[in-house]
């Protein structure tokens, strides 16, 4: 008789017995041998085909991308062949993010440059206030400001090195070295000097009808003054009285040695009053001569003209040879200038007509 239970193990526990054949058949799926194998093979084949299709699709996409890139490169090469070749790296495509970064960089660079120029202009404005050149009508250019500042620093350093008070003329010559004529006029106007007095080498560029600085003054052949000049407040019309001048106090003590020795007869400047600040006429600066206080008064005089017609031009000297005797300056019994303005205008017109005939 068979035992339904197996013998107990060493620990005395019963060992599980395998189920009978009919129970095993009910619990396990029916094993149709060749059909199950076919189904498994079909499933594996389907999985393999799907993987192969995916790989093929990926490879095809990669190939398409490569083809597109190759076509683009070929098009770019064709364009490059038509255009001259550029050196350096190829230009990348401008995407939206790169475009935004590019704009931001440009904005920052523009702001830096703007701040730099503002600082430079402010520094130049401060420098223009320091250098001895001031004008309400003209603003010095940047290069002229820097040149004048350099000359000013050099002149001050020479003063410190020598330890002596500088000569005004040499000081102004140092300041105006290498400057343009308008800037020189501005500097001279600030120091109340005439540019021709301290820059004789620049007078060669002046108009041909103007005498150079330092040249002897040639008096006119006629012993009377021209209509454009005020008549001198003397009882005689001798031309030697025209040159009894004193240096204007605007020149300072530096120019007094030029006037101490007295001016010889027939030499020296004509009537030049003190200089006002330079005037700007279309960018060119000129000096306006202000009449002195002595010339504010008017001096009426009478002139006797010959009754007959005027002779020809060569006889002008004979006609006016005795003009000094004919010109009389009565001091009493004459009305002031305001009393007969018409007479003065007629006299000036007559003198002008005589000169231009």
UniProtKB/Swiss-Prot annotation:
Biased composition (Basic and acidic residues): 35-58
Disulfide bonds listed in the record: none
CDD domains assigned to the protein according to its UniProt record, in alphabetical order: bHLH_TS_NeuroD1 (cd19719)
One of the GO biological process terms: axon development
Gene Ontology cellular component terms for the protein in this record: cytoplasm; nucleus
Motif extent (Nuclear localization signal): 90-96
Biased composition range(s): Acidic residues: 59-81
Stretch list, region Disordered: 1-96
Annotated SUPFAM superfamilies: HLH, helix-loop-helix DNA-binding domain
Quaternary assembly: Efficient DNA binding requires dimerization with another bHLH protein.
The keyword Transmembrane is annotated on this UniProt entry: no
PROSITE patterns xrefs: BHLH
InterPro entries, per the entry: bHLH_dom, bHLH_transcription_factors, HLH_DNA-bd_sf, NeuroD_DUF, TF_bHLH_NeuroD
Main location class: cytoplasm
SMART domains: HLH (SM00353)
One Pfam family here: HLH
Keywords: Activator, Cytoplasm, Developmental protein, Differentiation, DNA-binding, Neurogenesis, Nucleus, Transcription, Transcription regulation
bHLH domain span: 104-156
Protein name: Neurogenic differentiation factor 1
Reported function: Acts as a transcriptional activator that mediates transcriptional activation by binding to E box-containing promoter (5'-CANNTG-3'). Acts as a differentiation factor during neurogenesis. Induces photoreceptor cell overproduction in vivo and de novo generation in vitro. May play a role in photoreceptor cell production.
Gene Ontology MF annotations: DNA-binding transcription factor activity, RNA polymerase II-specific; E-box binding; protein dimerization activity
Localization in the cell: Cytoplasm; Nucleus
Ranges annotated as biased composition (Basic residues): 84-96
Compositional bias (Low complexity): 9-25
Organism: Gallus gallus (Chicken)
Stretches of the chain forming a coiled coil according to its record: none
């Amino acid at each position: 008789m068979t035992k339904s239970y197996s013998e107990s193990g060493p620990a005395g526990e019963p060992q599980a017995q395998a189920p009978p054949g009919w129970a095993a058949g009910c619990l396990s799926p029916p094993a149709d041998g060749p059909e199950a194998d076919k189904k498994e093979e079909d499933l594996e084949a389907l999985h393999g085909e799907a993987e192969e299709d995916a790989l093929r699709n990926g490879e095809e996409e990669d190939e398409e991308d490569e083809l597109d890139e190759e076509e683009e490169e070929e098009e770019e090469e064709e364009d490059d062949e038509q255009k001259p070749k550029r050196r350096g790296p190829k230009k990348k495509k401008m995407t939206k993010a790169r475009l935004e970064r590019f704009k931001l960089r440009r904005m920052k660079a523009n702001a830096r440059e703007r701040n730099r120029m503002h600082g430079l202009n402010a520094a130049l404005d401060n420098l223009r206030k320091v250098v001895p050149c001031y004008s309400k009508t003209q603003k010095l250019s940047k290069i002229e400001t820097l040149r004048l500042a350099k000359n000013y620093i050099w002149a001050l350093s020479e003063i410190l090195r020598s330890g002596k008070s500088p000569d005004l003329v040499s000081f102004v010559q140092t300041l105006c070295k290498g400057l343009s004529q308008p800037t020189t006029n501005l500097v001279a106007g600030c120091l109340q000097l005439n540019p021709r007095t301290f820059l004789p080498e620049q007078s060669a560029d002046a108009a041909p009808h103007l005498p150079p600085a330092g040249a002897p003054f040639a008096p006119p052949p006629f012993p009377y003054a021209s209509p454009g000049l005020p008549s001198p407040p003397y009882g005689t019309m001798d031309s030697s009285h025209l040159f009894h001048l004193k240096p204007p106090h605007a020149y300072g003590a530096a120019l007094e040695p030029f006037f101490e020795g007295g001016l010889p007869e027939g030499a020296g400047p004509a009537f030049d009053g003190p200089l006002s600040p330079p005037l700007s006429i279309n960018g060119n600066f000129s000096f306006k001569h202000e009449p002195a206080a002595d010339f504010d008064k008017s001096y009426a005089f009478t002139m006797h003209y010959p009754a007959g017609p005027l002779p020809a031009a060569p006889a002008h000297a004979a006609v006016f040879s005795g003009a000094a005797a004919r010109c009389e300056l009565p001091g009493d019994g004459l009305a002031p200038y305001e009393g007969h303005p018409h007479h003065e205008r007629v006299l000036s017109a007559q003198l002008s007509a005589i000169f231009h005939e």
